[in-house]
């Protein structure tokens, strides 16, 4: 099994790169998708409602993520404490699910004859380095994007300024490119030309070996 980790700011184009790997047969583990699933767990719903109030739930009793985001992303100490609490609730569950998925994939690979390269796993995890996933990866791909294009993508998400600033600050916290082992690094430019972005991913894929 080969594990590839994607690194990049919000709006850089990590999902586009992940989708191209998936088109080649890579197995993408999308932490955002898993986090959304975690927020549907009854115990998590109960704790979130207790912390933020029942008005963050819709008529079906599901968490309205945008309402929760308003409470955890912002400039005040209360926002910071709320975000820390939410992360302490959600992140361990997300990590557990990712680990379980990777264990299952590795077990499946062990039964292959011949083993060949095995599954290529792509970790699409926000704050991959800051969350400690980089050490698990065989390859790290930094997804770059022009600031102008990235800002356009973020505008399309309709986050309020406080939410965007808090998410950007989360990236800046405890991150330095110097932390990354150069022997694992590749980069992809995802500034806009989809065919060009795909061609870079294709080249990386063709060079993978087990």
PLM regions: where:
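Hydrophobic anchor at the beta1->P-loop junction of P-loop NTPases
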Residues: 6
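P-loop (Walker A) phosphate-binding loop of NTP-binding proteins
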Residues: 9, 21
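ATP-binding Walker
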Residues: 12
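Walker A/P-loop
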Residues: 15
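ATP-dependent small-molecule kinase phosphotransfer cores
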Residues: 36-119
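ATP-dependent NMP and nucleoside kinases share a basic, alpha-helical "lid"
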Residues: 99-107, 111-155
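Small-molecule kinase domains that catalyze NTP-dependent phosphoryl transfer to phosphate-bearing small molecules
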Residues: 134-136, 155-210
């Amino acid at each position: 099994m080969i594990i590839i980790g994607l690194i990049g700011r919000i709006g850089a184009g990590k999902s586009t790169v992940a989708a191209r790997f998936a088109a080649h047969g890579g197995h993408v583990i999308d932490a955002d998708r898993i986090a959304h699933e975690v927020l549907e767990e009854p115990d998590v719903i109960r704790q979130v409602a207790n912390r933020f109030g029942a008005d963050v739930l819709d008529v079906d009793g599901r968490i309205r993520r945008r309402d929760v985001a308003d409470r955890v992303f912002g400039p005040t100490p209360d926002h910071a404490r709320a975000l820390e609490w939410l992360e302490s609730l959600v992140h361990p569950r997300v990590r557990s699910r990712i680990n379980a998925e990777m264990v299952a994939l590795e077990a499946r690979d062990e039964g292959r004859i011949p083993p060949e390269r095995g599954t290529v796993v792509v970790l699409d995890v926000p704050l991959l380095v800051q969350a400690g996933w980089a050490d698990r990866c065989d390859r790290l791909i930094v997804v770059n994007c022009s600031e102008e294009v990235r800002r356009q993508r973020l505008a399309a998400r309709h986050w309020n300024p406080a939410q965007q600033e808090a998410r950007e600050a989360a990236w800046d916290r405890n991150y330095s490119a110097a932390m990354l082992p150069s022997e694992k690094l590749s980069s992809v430019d995802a500034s806009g030309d989809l065919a060009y972005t795909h061609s870079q991913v294709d080249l990386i894929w063709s060079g993978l070996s087990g």
